[in-house]
Amino acid sequence: MSRFVRCSAPLAVLAACAALAPTALADAPATASKSCSVGNSRSYGTTYVLSIRASGTSCRSARRLVRAFHACRPGKSGRCGSVSGYRCSESRFNKSSQSYDSRVTCSRGGNTVKHTYTQFT
């Protein structure tokens, strides 16, 4: 085998792989987290919803889940562990006698919805 053939064969394989890579990546599902519009921040059943992020689901579904989460909470100091098939965890911070802020993460399979809210007590 000539030296030219030995050197050019691996290069041809690399070129073919490089040509196919963009099409393989284009078929991969997008699961990037996106920021969703809150709209009327007081329409969720809590004092103020500050932000909503969705991954693997639509913003419309994320807003619906946030409303269901706050409907599930029994009162201002209540918590909701699961809603609409999602498992939810909550971390409260900036606590005072008048209010607290909270970060909530709800997950189901590859879908995740995160939101933050302020609750006056």
Role assignments for model-derived ranges:
Residues 18-34:
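C-terminal region of N-terminal signal peptides and the immediate post-cleavage residues
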Residues 29-66, 74-92:
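Extracytoplasmic low-complexity, Pro/Thr/Ser/Ala/Gly-rich segments
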Residues 1-11:
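Bacterial N-terminal signal peptides that target proteins for export
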Residues 10-19:
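Bacterial N-terminal signal peptides
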